[in-house]
């Protein structure tokens, strides 16, 4: 409901979604775009998301949005796909929803890449500002130094990169999400 209200309130028509897990958020965003007269979504996650049950393709088909969303499965990071979008110079977005990576490396670079794809006046929303990998028992997480496992890395990106950036303003936080608007320069 929060995302749908935001899309309506800000007249969003083109969305870049970084991280989709099963694709539930993407379906909600597609429904909200349909309610405001249509739009487009590019949604990117890791190849491992393809194996989830249900996966984004199945959910989009069930909801009737399979032909309205471009989705990509990447082997390492959504950042590689964004590099391609920047190279192609065919798409810009008025909203980027960041709900993947959740670490300094992916989310930090993603901020600067999204900046190249985000229209002036567009918004970035960072989900899970205070999430940590502290309680994960996955091998990849356990290989990280303790400091990285206990640090809310999306929060670090928000505080150290996004908020001080001269091209962003209208910052606010709500329910673990950080909102920032790209100013018209």
Where are the regions a protein language model picked out?
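S-adenosylmethionine/decaboxylated-SAM
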Residues: 1-185
């Amino acid at each position: 409901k929060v995302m749908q209200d935001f899309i309506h309130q800000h007249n969003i028509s083109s969305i870049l979604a970084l991280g989709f897990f099963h694709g539930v958020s993407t379906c909600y965003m597609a429904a909200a775009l349909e309610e405001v007269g249509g739009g487009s979504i590019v949604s990117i996650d890791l190849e491992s998301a393809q194996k989830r049950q249900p996966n984004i393709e199945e959910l989009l088909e069930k909801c009737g949005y399979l032909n309205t969303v471009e989705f990509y499965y990447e082997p390492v990071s959504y950042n590689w796909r964004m590099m391609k979008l920047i190279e192609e110079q065919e798409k810009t977005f008025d909203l980027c929803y960041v709900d993947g990576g959740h670490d300094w490396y992916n989310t930090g670079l993603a901020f600067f890449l999204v900046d190249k794809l985000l229209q002036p006046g567009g918004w970035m929303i960072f989900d899970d500002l205070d999430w940590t990998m502290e309680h994960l028992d996955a091998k990849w997480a356990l290989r990280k130094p303790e400091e990285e496992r206990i640090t809310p890395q999306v929060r670090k990106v928000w505080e150290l990169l996004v908020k001080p950036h001269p091209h962003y303003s209208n910052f606010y936080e709500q329910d673990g999400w950080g909102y920032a608007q790209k100013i018209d320069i």
